[in-house]
Amino acid sequence: MMKRSNLWMLATILACGLVMASCLDEQIDKPSTTEPEQTSAKDPGKWWINENNMDKTVNPGDNFFMYCNGSWWKNTTIPQGKNYVDQFTNVKPTFQERIGSLDNPNLQTFLTHLKWADDGSEAAIAGQRLYDDVLAQSGLNEAKTKEDVLRAFGRMAAMGVCPGAWLEPMFIDGKVCLYAKYYLEEEMVEPVIDGLDLAIPDQPSLLQMMQDDPSLQSHLVPLAGRSGTRAVPDDCLPLRYIVEGMGFDPKDVYFLDDYYKKKNVQNESIDYSVKRDKRDYNETFSLALSIEKLKKAVLHYYGLDYGFISQKTRAAYDEQYMKENELSPSETSKVGMKALVAVMALNYTSYMNAKVVADQMVPKSLKEEYLKYCEELRTVFAQRIKANEWMSEGSKKNALEKLEAMVFNVGYPDKWVEEALPDLSKSKSLIEDIYSFRKSRVNLLKAIIGKTRQEASFTVMLMNGLPLSKENAEYFSFYNAITIFPYYLLPPRHDPAQSLAINYAYLYVFGHEMTHGFDTNGSQYDKNGDYREGGIWASEADKAEFDRRAGLLVKWFGSFDVLPDEMPGVKAEGKVTLPENIADLGGIEIAWQAYINRLQADGYTGQELKLMKQRFFLAYANEWCAKYGQKHVDYFSFGKERSEGPDPHSLNKERVNGILPNMDDWYDLFGVKPGDKLYLAPADRIHIW
């Protein structure tokens, strides 16, 4: 995936000091003054790449990154306390600041209500009324059977009460269904008290787990019996009745068997099975309980929200909780405002906030423009696959089918679920806000059940807390979808007024994400996003040739000195960065061919055509204009003091110098010849996609 450098982010002005260049290096050809202008099209956009950033003393064939960015590197100081700076570092306002300035009435209402209501205030009275009404409407008190008690609990959850079952979207046979698991006392009650969570289970989503281990799907069991399926165990039957009460068909809801509990018995931190806490959750909603005890268990969950009504109810709840759990006052605290903001933003408001961003920042015309660009790149990619000389027809067929099925999530979802967009205009209290958020989530789940994986991919991502404010573009192999966030659609990342060369060089990002579907990881998944043994390869020979070419890329990138002056002899990491390097190489080649097609269609010829071609490579190098030192290299490339380990991307210099020498046209355009440090003989140039 691409990487550049939780509520909201945006950069809208060009980096300070960037001006339209009056000329380029002597090696870059100018349009002939004797050639009639009408013989060639002219670039109507602005060429704002600053010539003063270049270092003309550097031979392009020795270090193209420094040839394009060397003077900027020399003249730029890394800010104190930082290890990295690029041309967008000091751009103001930032992406987050721009988004934070949007008109978001629901969010403002919620932020206003985060302060606990005074006892007896209008807000406290409204919150208490809602709290009481939900219980009355649920039918819990009138329930005559245990099953009806649990269905009443489900109805309460559909109205916004803290649920006893957590439902997540997932996919079976390519269609959206739901995964259900119990809320755990230890995961829910204590975090609510100490201000760290709002009843959100502290575990990865099932979709994340399935991407880590595709075999997980074989251990999913439906809550309603189907022909040939295993029977629902007694300890999961309560889930069935709860989801029925919420308005879901149990045939669309699954749970995990005990496989993962057994598999991870030696790793207590990883347990994907239906877990029980120290008070034995199996007994909390067990059908073996009497109706009275089962109602009491439901009321316990209902009571978890009581503390959100006012200061008085908060204190009463804290006192009761401490007494039941034998805690001292120092061991618990009231829910903090910042914690509530963070959790709500990530888990309940992301869909609502995404709609605000879409409406106010990404016009439909912009989304449509980029969808056309994506289709343009898809066409080029398909042509390249068909012309591929090392793949068999069977592998080509699989690759083409996967490319054709690939979904382009650009800017925002194609369709919005209005019932999933809360309206807090009449809300007067925090608990009303929370109930509204939870109800909206249930409505969204109902709306996407039965949709195809590709249809629902963007919505599911937003449900799982992926914000549209993310400064990224990503490929998700599980969905076979690329997602282009608004950051990459707006200035300074994209500007329709700038040169065609800059915009097409920038489209490399999109080609990069497409190519991720065919890198060492993505190629293991089929057109539907399902993991397949053997991946897209129709023969072992095709896979072996792919691996051979990938190995050449590892060796090539591993030949670069990361910082020759500061870290002599230290080479770049080629193996860890391989998937990203494959995507970089494929992305730039796809964007380049699309650009050439555009230049030809627009009528560029002669010296003007050559100049436009050169500008594409200059713009690509400018995309990676940055400065960094040893601390950044140690942290970024080698994972020193970085909890997640080395970054999977190459350093900026290698994303230029490691990629472009594999492109034949680059040599002629910049006079690169044998003996230059970056020169690769034609037979040694690496082409994969």
Give the label of every model feature segment.
Residues 1-10:
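Bacterial N-terminal signal peptides that target proteins for export
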Residues 17-42:
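Bacterial Sec-dependent N-terminal signal peptides
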Residues 38-52:
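Short, Gly/Pro- and small/polar-rich lid/capping loops
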Residues 42-43, 59-62, 67-124:
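Active-site-surrounding "flap" and adjacent substrate/cofactor-binding loops of secreted or lumenal enzymes
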Residues 57, 254-292, 296-328, 332, ...:
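Functional cleft and adjacent loop/helix regions within the main domain
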Residues 100-377:
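Noncatalytic, helix-rich "gating/capping" subdomain that lines the substrate-entry/channel surface
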Residues 371-507, 516-689:
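Zinc-dependent metallohydrolase catalytic domains
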